[in-house]
Amino acid sequence: MKTIFTLILALFTLSCAPKSAEQTQSDKYTVEGTITVSKECDVEWLTRYEEKYIKALKERATVEPAECDVMFFGSSSIRLWKTLKEDFAPLTVVNRGYGGATLRDLHYNYETVMAHYKPKAFVFYCDNDLRTKPEIDIPVGELFDLARMLFNRIEQDYPGVPVYFLAMKHCKRREAIRDRQAMYNALMKEYAERSSNQLIYVDTCTPLQTADGEIDTTLFVEDNIHLNAEGYKRWVEILRPLLIK
């Protein structure tokens, strides 16, 4: 059977609902909202990490306590943050990041990622929607809309809980899209400043650069995308004072 999964953002409500089979032509996942965005993705693509990462997230949610100080979620830069608990002690933190995450499949996996947790704050990072691969890449404006939808949903589900948005980092592997990353960061910064006190923009991009604005490659591992221990220390220096007050 073929179906379309639809994520609808109303003025004050966000919910998921399947469309009937006679309305569909192929397996698609559609994101729509009052901020006027519609994005269809193959369900097969959205579920590509079900066995590799999502299944583990589901299993961990059954044994981890619901109460926590901070939930970190997003893509592999979160998942690979091995010193997360030590870096933010004595806070209780949970790591809900998974490799390859995009805003598109984070909408699809929203309930799984959030699960039963009741955090006092969120920290979000994801940089996989802007790519040099045309089969994955989406326009900056479309990504901005998807981000707004995600944060609007969190505000409805977790009223008053701050969300720290980590700016998209520049890296050598994706240097060709640096201007687009900067554009997205600028849009998110302005949106956070204008929207509400719940979304806080954190510049985690500039600290990874040299004094002349170039990418500091000494802060990255060999793939030139992910941070090494020194790179994460730069993030901790910025984030820790915000989370531990």
Regions found by a protein language model. Name each.
Residues 70-73, 93-97, 121-126, 162-167, ...:
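Structural recognition of the beta-strand scaffold that forms the well-ordered cores
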Residues 169-245:
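Catalytic His-Asp segment of secreted/periplasmic serine-dependent ester chemistry enzymes
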Residues 78-87, 92, 105-144, 168-172:
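Oxyanion-hole/transition-state-stabilizing segment in secreted/luminal serine hydrolases
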Residues 9, 89, 118-119, 159, ...:
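Proline-centered flexible-loop/turn and helix-kink motifs
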Residues 67-83:
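Catalytic nucleophile-elbow at a beta strand-turn-alpha helix junction centered on a G-D-S/GDSL motif
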Residues 1-70, 86:
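N-terminal secretory targeting modules
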Residues 141-166, 183, 187-201:
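Charged, glycine-enriched surface loops/patches
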Residues 59-70, 107-116, 152-155:
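Short amphipathic alpha-helices and their capping/turn segments at secondary-structure boundaries
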